[in-house]
């Protein structure tokens, strides 16, 4: 493969990681929660796509809409059932709950669908397009475009809308935001909805690229997306995108030089190096806390 082809592959994989990392960074930025069930929400979205297209024989467009809607509703439900009752509990309690929700979703999917991988039909024609002797994958181009548009919309919502201002107020000081008349629980639920919707989009793009759904597919995908969020500076939207692209490029280029068995190790090594040099991540900011 040519260098430019590898760059395109890195952009495609990095875009998927970036979308998932955005979900992590949104939730952490509001309530300082590492939602370890986030990767499993992607798994649910992939299974929804498989059911709609393979089992029901419906259109890919409907599969996309139902996957995003299903992930959004699941994210809000998880917040209401598992996290909202622990809003004032110690942070460790919520973290353990998040891990429990993750295991529940994984084992529930295995119980319902079995451990074998389900083949998700391709959404679009995957035949490569040749431009100036460069093989361009329609799936890769669509993935990059969707991620760019999703990031732009998310940035606009957070920076320019009333609800986005409420989200930023809650992230700065939840108590003060409540005193100013902001409905904190509604704001947090909306944050989960947005993060989970991004996970649904990520599920669709991942299914397009790899054409399969398994109960544990969200584990490594979610872990690497979390690494991407931390690399870029968790809580930062541009940081999540930069981190996702770094992880994607690292994986692709390590595989390209024949060291694919080391690609996961290189990703985590990259995280260690960045945190040693800049513990807050590339675009993260240092925060002081009075005790």
What is each model feature region?
Residues 85-160, 187, 211, 253, ...:
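Transmembrane helix-bundle core of multi-pass membrane transporters
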């Amino acid at each position: 493969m040519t260098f430019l082809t590898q760059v395109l592959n890195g952009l495609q994989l990095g875009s998927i990681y970036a979308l998932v990392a955005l979900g992590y960074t949104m939730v952490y930025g509001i309530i300082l929660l590492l939602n370890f069930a986030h990767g499993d929400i992607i798994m649910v979205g992939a299974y929804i796509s498989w059911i709609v297209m393979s089992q029901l024989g419906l259109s890919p467009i409907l599969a996309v809409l139902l996957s995003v809607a299903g992930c959004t509703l699941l994210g809000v439900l998880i917040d209401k059932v598992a996290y909202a009752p622990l809003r004032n509990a110690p942070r460790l309690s919520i973290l353990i709950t998040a891990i429990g929700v993750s295991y529940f979703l994984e084992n529930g999917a295995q119980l319902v669908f079995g451990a074998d991988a389900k083949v998700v039909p391709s959404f679009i024609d995957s035949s490569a397009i040749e431009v100036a002797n460069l093989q361009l994958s329609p799936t890769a181009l669509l993935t990059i475009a969707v991620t760019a548009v999703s990031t732009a919309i998310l940035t606009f919502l957070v920076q320019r809308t009333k609800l986005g201002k409420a989200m930023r107020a809650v992230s700065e000081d939840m108590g003060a935001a409540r005193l100013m008349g902001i409905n904190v629980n509604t704001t947090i639920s909306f944050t989960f909805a947005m993060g989970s919707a991004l996970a649904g989009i990520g599920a669709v793009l991942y299914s397009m690229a790899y054409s399969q759904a398994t109960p544990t597919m969200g584990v490594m995908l979610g872990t690497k997306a979390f690494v991407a969020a931390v690399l870029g500076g968790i809580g930062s939207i541009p940081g999540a995108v930069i981190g996702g692209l770094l992880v994607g490029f690292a994986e692709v280029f390590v595989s390209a030089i024949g060291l694919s068995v080391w690609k996961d190790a290189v990703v985590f090594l990259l995280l260690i190096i960045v945190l040693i040099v800049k513990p807050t991540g590339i675009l993260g900011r240092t925060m002081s806390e009075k005790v």
